[in-house]
């Protein structure tokens, strides 16, 4: 059982190396551990998974206020104390950062999964509450990253701070140039974020010399709930792996459990 939290709580189950399901529950700071446990158990029941069959659990949390509540909820649901991704846990990743302990757990988990599934060098884009970009060099070192405002965060900020702009859906407009306010906003969100990703990739690739002077080209992997909305409009060749984080959690779990 793998769980990560942020704006949404992502819950999934992995059997051997296969992801059985991935679902999202809304993050609610007012909920008790019992309420979260009921939500987790309901999801398991929907997929006909008996909680007694769960043999292990791991959590990647970027919301400190919820760590203990989510941990207790998992214990109530499956009767297992979950592993927590964080300082002291084995990842197999060499992090060459000024403050390695400050690197977001999701960025680490994504990088671990990418190295295991796609190799190095690699650039990993995770489009969630924040849009993060992680860079792993040809020696499999985690060498840096980028953190941008997430797409929904940007839209919510735009709408809340401007009196005349409405909330919009995130479907693609007919043209890059809108003919009405809603399509203008959609173009800014969809094509603007795609252009941002392309621009950041250009700069990262150039800064690291990927693909020149004998250096291998970097594979570019994208994940997160909104990757499928933005990536099709990017000019770079980007592979979408919606299950990247759950795969990474399973790999890290295996590294930290005796007998694996």
Model-derived regions: residue spans:
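N-terminal glycine-rich anion-binding loops that anchor highly charged ligand groups
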Residues: 9-17
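N-terminal phosphate-binding loop and adjacent alpha-helix
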Residues: 19-69, 152, 157, 192
């Amino acid at each position: 059982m793998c769980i990560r939290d942020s704006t949404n709580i992502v819950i999934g189950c992995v059997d051997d190396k296969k992801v059985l399901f991935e679902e999202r529950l809304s993050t609610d700071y007012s909920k008790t551990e019992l309420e979260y446990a009921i939500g987790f158990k309901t999801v398991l029941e929907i997929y006909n998974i008996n909680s007694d069959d769960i043999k292990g659990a791991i959590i990647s949390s970027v919301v400190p206020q919820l760590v203990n509540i989510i941990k207790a909820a998992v214990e109530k649901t499956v009767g297992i104390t979950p592993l927590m991704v964080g300082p002291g846990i084995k990842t197999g990743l060499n992090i060459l950062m000024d403050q390695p302990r400050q690197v977001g757990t999701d960025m680490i988990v994504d990088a671990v999964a990418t190295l295991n599934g796609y190799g190095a060098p690699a650039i990993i884009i995770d489009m969630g509450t924040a849009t993060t970009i992680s860079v792993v060099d040809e020696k499999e070192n985690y060498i840096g990253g980028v953190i941008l405002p997430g797409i929904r965060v940007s839209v919510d900020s735009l709408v809340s701070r401007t009196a005349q702009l409405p909330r919009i859906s995130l479907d693609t407009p007919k043209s890059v140039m809108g003919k009405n306010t809603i399509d203008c906003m959609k173009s800014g969100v969809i094509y603007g974020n795609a252009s941002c990703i392309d621009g950041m990739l250009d700069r990262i690739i150039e800064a690291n010399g990927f693909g020149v002077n004998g250096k291998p080209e970097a594979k570019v992997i994208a994940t997160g709930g909104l990757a499928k909305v933005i990536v099709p409009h990017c000019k770079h060749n980007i592979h979408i792996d919606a299950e990247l984080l759950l795969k990474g959690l399973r790999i890290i779990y295996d590294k930290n459990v005796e007998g694996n």
